[in-house]
């Protein structure tokens, strides 16, 4: 897609200058100072064929948010040269009084420590943003997102930039497996066994399109994996935080879209359903869901004894992370002799968990087997927190793709959810691939998804008739080492 040659970001003369801004002290991180000009020197960002998008515009955004909402802007020497696990990094703490902020308000910003722009090529800068959100219990909470800036910025005819929020399938109940840290190592590793390249390679490909790319830690600081409301809120509020930065600077408007595959669709689908009531004014103009998961607990039988059986444990611990009564019940039903092994998923990284529990009978960890998981106390929680397809009708256009022979997440529930959304008036293109399975559809669906996203970002998409288009397709991309999503 051709790049717009005029991409220099213009600052409004009414915005505060750097010299007008102050940096607040933070009792957790120590005293910051006003030398932000030196501490946040950013690389130049090429724009289009001849223009240069000046990072000063983004620097103004980082500083302006401090004055507007009390965010704590940190110098590079306050954070670490190399990233620390979130549970050990004092930056991953909300400042006092964050509960009084509004969802999407920025609480902290820093340049991502270490070599993230080297790990993720095609990125000119990367930021960690800590923002106010809402947890699964509808209580004030916070989360972190990682924002990548491309080397060349695409602008739509309206002059808006394109922001793609990609929700990774984090599949972990360990806070230290959050994407903001995982991007440095486990998400930067290829998976030769499955013939898949790293997530960071895929992010680099997205950046090459000229899009801003957002990767939220949608499960939050408690790693509430599988809690759809938590993930949906965090996805929405990460976008709100970025749009808030842009609106403060007057630098650029944003056309935002959301995308997730497999476990990432839980956050993406929840955000789409929550948007009409939780954030009706947010500008999310499109959503893509591949290999869609509609009911986390409904897939336990197919996951049990599979290579990814650990996902069952991560889900049970993640969904109950913010619900003490349900967590207490869950732990009370574990076989004492293997309880510690089950609970170790809270502390080991997701890859080690997958290897350790591959092929295992997870139901055997419970005193009464699967019956303990089917108890009303857990099923009621799953019904309230771990399903999509039962909320509001998503208001944005959607592209949904899935392999008919998906062996990990059967297609039947997806068909039902799509039909419900269609009956409610949603604008959906749903493609059911006649070839491949869950893993193959990662690559088979990617070109179609990107092509559809371009129609959203270049503002050429228009509602079609009928509003829902459901079709079987036969798409097989040649086997190669490809980006894992």
UniProtKB/Swiss-Prot annotation:
Pfam families per record: LIP (PF03583)
Phylogenetic lineage: Eukaryota, Fungi, Dikarya, Ascomycota, Pezizomycotina
Positions annotated as active site in the UniProt record: 262, 406, 438
Biased composition (Low complexity): 9-23
Stated family: Belongs to the AB hydrolase superfamily. Lipase family.
Function: Probable trichothecene esterase; part of the satratoxin SC1 cluster involved in the biosynthesis of satratoxins, trichothecene mycotoxins that are associated with human food poisonings. Satratoxins are suggested to be made by products of multiple gene clusters (SC1, SC2 and SC3) that encode 21 proteins in all, including polyketide synthases, acetyltransferases, and other enzymes expected to modify the trichothecene skeleton. SC1 encodes 10 proteins, SAT1 to SAT10.
Major enzyme class: hydrolase
Lineage: superkingdom: Eukaryota
Protein name (Swiss-Prot/TrEMBL): Probable trichothecene esterase SAT6
GO biological process annotation, one example: lipid catabolic process
Keyword Hydrolase: yes
Keywords: Hydrolase
Hydrolase listed as a keyword: yes
EC number of this enzyme: 3.1.1.-
Organism: Stachybotrys chartarum (strain CBS 109288 / IBT 7711) (Toxic black mold)
Residue ranges of the region described as Disordered: 1-23
Note: Trichothecenes are sesquiterpenoid toxins that act by inhibiting protein biosynthesis.
Involved pathway(s): Mycotoxin biosynthesis
Molecular function as annotated in GO: triacylglycerol lipase activity
């Amino acid at each position: 897609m051709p790049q717009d040659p005029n991409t220099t970001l213009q600052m409004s003369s009414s915005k505060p200058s750097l010299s007008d801004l102050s940096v607040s002290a933070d009792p957790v991180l120590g005293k910051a100072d006003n030398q932000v000009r030196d501490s946040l020197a950013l690389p130049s960002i090429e724009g289009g064929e001849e223009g240069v998008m000046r990072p000063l515009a983004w620097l103004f955004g980082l500083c302006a948010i401090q004055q507007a909402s009390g965010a704590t802007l940190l110098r590079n020497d306050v954070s670490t040269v190399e990233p620390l696990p979130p549970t050990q990094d004092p930056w991953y703490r909300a400042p006092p009084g964050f509960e009084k902020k509004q969802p999407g308000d920025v609480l902290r910003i820093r340049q991502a420590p270490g070599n993230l722009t080297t790990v993720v090529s095609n990125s000119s800068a990367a930021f960690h943003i800590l923002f106010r959100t809402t947890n699964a219990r509808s209580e004030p909470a916070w989360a972190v997102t990682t924002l990548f800036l491309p080397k060349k910025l695409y602008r739509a005819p309206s002059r808006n930039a394109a922001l793609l929020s990609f929700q990774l399938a984090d599949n972990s109940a360990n806070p230290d497996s959050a994407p903001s840290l995982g991007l440095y190592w486990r998400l930067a590793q290829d998976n030769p066994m499955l013939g898949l390249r790293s997530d960071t390679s895929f992010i680099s490909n997205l950046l090459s399109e000229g899009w801003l790319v957002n990767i939220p830690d949608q499960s939050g600081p408690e790693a509430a994996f599988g809690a759809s409301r938590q993930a949906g809120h965090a996805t929405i509020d990460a976008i709100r935080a970025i749009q808030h930065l842009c609106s403060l600077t007057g630098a650029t408007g944003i056309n935002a879209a959301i995308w997730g595959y497999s476990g990432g669709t839980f956050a993406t689908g929840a955000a789409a359903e929550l948007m009409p009531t939780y954030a009706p004014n947010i500008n999310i103009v499109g959503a893509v869901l591949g290999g869609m998961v509609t009911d986390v607990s409904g897939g336990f039988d197919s996951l049990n004894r599979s290579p990814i059986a650990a996902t069952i444990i991560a889900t049970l611990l993640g969904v109950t992370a913010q619900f003490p009564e349900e967590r207490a019940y869950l732990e009370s039903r574990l076989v004492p002799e293997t309880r510690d092994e089950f609970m170790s998923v809270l502390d080991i990284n997701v890859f080690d968990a997958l290897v350790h529990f591959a092929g295992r009978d997870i139901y055997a960890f419970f005193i009464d087997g699967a019956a303990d998981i089917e108890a009303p106390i857990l099923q009621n929680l799953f019904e309230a927190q771990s399903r999509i397809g039962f909320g509001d009708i998503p208001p944005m256009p959607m592209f949904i793709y899935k392999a008919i022979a998906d062996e990990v997440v059967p297609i039947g529930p997806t068909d039902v959810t799509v039909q419900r959304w269609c009956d409610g008036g949603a604008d959906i293109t749903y493609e059911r691939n006649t070839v491949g399975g869950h893993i193959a559809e990662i690559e088979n669906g990617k070109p179609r998804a990107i092509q559809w996203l371009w129609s959203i970002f270049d503002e050429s998409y228009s509602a079609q008739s009928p509003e829902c288009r459901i079709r079987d397709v036969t798409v097989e991309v040649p086997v190669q080492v490809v980006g894992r999503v």
